[in-house]
Amino acid sequence: MNDSLTIAGKSYRSRLLVGTGKYKDFAETRAAIDASGAEIVTVAIRRTNIGQNADEPNLLDVLPPERFTILPNTAGCYTADDAVRTLRLARELLDGHALVKLEVLGDPVSLFPNMPETLKAAETLVKDGFQVMVYCADDPIQAKMLEDIGCVAVMPLASLIGSGMGILNPWNLRLIIDQANVPVLVDAGVGTASDAAIAMELGCDGVLMNTAIAHAKDPVLMASAMKKAVEAGREAFLAGRMPRKHYSADPSSPTSGLIGS
């Protein structure tokens, strides 16, 4: 079955996107990403060397752009201006690469998105030729506004970044999914494989995660688990779950037509 994820006109086999931070070293980063099967990897430009500093190890030596789609992000930015400046730098470092992940944070404690600044930055970046995937609140109205601006994917949080609390508001996610004409990917809050599966069962087009893998006791094994969870959740969504019944039990084994009855 051909069931690829298409973002900005490019198709991907994997619906799991992963971050590159918080690992003990680049070797563990590469091993975990290989185990995840991810094709899109996101990189915090303000925290990770992808060529800005010639004297430091370069992540692109471990994750070559020829094999992976590098998704620069604006983690650590708290204003639209900072986010735009950061992604313009990333475009220079990556030879005109246009696909980016925008996140503008509200405060350093919750890391909740600052939506007015996010909307402002998104509008500027889209006009500047970027293909913007955007981290946002689980607000259906603002998610639709980001789509209308021209973002190529909306990425509502499941819960706070790094919290591992899972999906706290599935109803809002479903509203966002039902109205969207661009891919919807859960971003932030996934803690374990069942969270990823639930996101996919709700109808999300993909899941992005970092801490859930990097802070697991065995990151490589957790990456493998997340790969399977995303695949299983997607298949369950496509298969269509049975209706929930709060009454009138329907036994798996029929009681009529039994031998000897």
From Swiss-Prot:
It comes from the Bacteria. Its EC number is 2.8.1.10. Its main location: cytoplasm. One of its GO terms (cellular component) is cytoplasm. The active site is at K101. Keywords: Cytoplasm, Schiff base, Thiamine biosynthesis, Transferase. Pathway: Cofactor biosynthesis; thiamine diphosphate biosynthesis. One of its GO terms (biological process) is thiamine diphosphate biosynthetic process. Belongs to the ThiG family. Catalyzes the rearrangement of 1-deoxy-D-xylulose 5-phosphate (DXP) to produce the thiazole phosphate moiety of thiamine. Sulfur is provided by the thiocarboxylate moiety of the carrier protein ThiS. In vitro, sulfur can be provided by H(2)S. PANTHER family: THIAZOLE SYNTHASE (PTHR34266:SF2). This is Thiazole synthase. The lineage of its organism: Bacteria, Pseudomonadati, Pseudomonadota, Betaproteobacteria, Rhodocyclales.
